[in-house]
Amino acid sequence: MHCNSFSRQHRFSLHVAMTALTLLLLGLLAGCAATSSAVTSKLPDWRSWTVERKIAQMLLLGFPGETITPESPISVAIREHGVGGVVLFDNNADLGVTERNISNPAQLKRLITDLKASAETPIFIAVDEEGGIISRLKERYGFPSTVSASYLGEKNDLNLTRSSSDRLVDTLVEYGFNLNLAPVVDLSINPANPVIALKQRSFSADPALVSAHAAEVIASHHRKNIVTCLKHFPGHGSSRDDSHVGFVDVTDSWSEKELLPYKNLIGQGVVDSVMTAHTFNTHLDPDYPATLSRNTIDGILRTRLGFDGVVISDDLYMAAIVQHYSYETAVEKAINAGVDLLILANDKLYSPDIAPRTIDLVVKMVESGKISRERIDQACGRIMKLKARYLFE
């Protein structure tokens, strides 16, 4: 009698537990479906757009000046052409750029407000705010101080990384940014690397440590609806040269472990976008640098690592590209390689008509068959899906 009673009680408890588990799983599935549905419901009917407007979404433009008017070329590019976004810089005398976008907090807030007001479809307001040396919102301009990735990696305290990232993100939110071109997940393989290690941009040479700290940085941004971007794929940390100033070949220094932070973070499902490097590696592609390489972007990043989000080029105006390829070739190769969003910093050789000129250029490539309409739809679709998740009210 006692055994039968225990058995009935045991079966009843098991039934209750299984029912609770079933309800929990159904709730989770419903939540996922609701999230997916919510993202989809926010999307405008972009498929009905003209090919010109879809191409415009693929442009992330730089421009000179700390203020804009409705007649400014960037205002026209946003309002009339529908470009996907802008990227803001401070002055960079090292690169000969002395008229950019950031001088003080009040000026910046006004500029970003005016940029957003020009847009019918929400635009990316992007910045390279990595912390430490690579900071556009510098303390001397009146913004809060930040620390570098290398400092955080040396401390190796995830709580410190989280709190530091939270403070940085609060600044981005305060001024209206919605896309931070960070974190850097390059491995600090070459301590004399002029563009990574010497600029204190890497957490570590250890892929696991880089992955862990980058995950904290990403989480800080996501808590405040800021889009992030891993860079520089497939790895710039072993280089001896700087792609801002010339050709960079990592064939003899690059290693497979440089892919591990991407693999780890993509596997966690937290990666919004990935920026390509202008590095050349004959082991990955005997003909083209990563930004222009279908083998690297479509073959490794998408097929091998399983990433189906937005791929962003590093600036196509950098010397590693412009010294070796015409503008037309760079744009065509980048899009066909799998780049969805083209950064055109438009700095040392400023072109006020960069938006309509690039749109017309790509339209002609579509009409001639050099770039397929399907590829444009694929890129625009990824961009709009990302915007719906973070930018749409």
Residue ranges and their predicted role:
Residues M1-R11:
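N-terminal secretory signal peptides that target proteins for export/translocation
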Residues L361, V366-E393:
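Mid-to-C-terminal alpha-helical segments outside catalytic/metal-binding sites
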Residues P64-E66, V127-S135, E139-R140, N178-N190, ...:
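Short glycine-enriched loops at secondary-structure junctions
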Residues T50, T69-P73, V86, T98-S118, ...:
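Second-shell residues forming the walls of enzyme active-site clefts
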Residues A30-G31:
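C-terminal motif of bacterial Sec signal peptides marking the signal peptidase cleavage site
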Residues A34-E139, I343, K385:
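N-terminal hydrophobic targeting/anchoring segments and the immediately downstream early-domain regions
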Residues V147-N178, A182-A214, I218-H222:
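A substrate-binding/cap region within the structured catalytic cores of diverse enzymes
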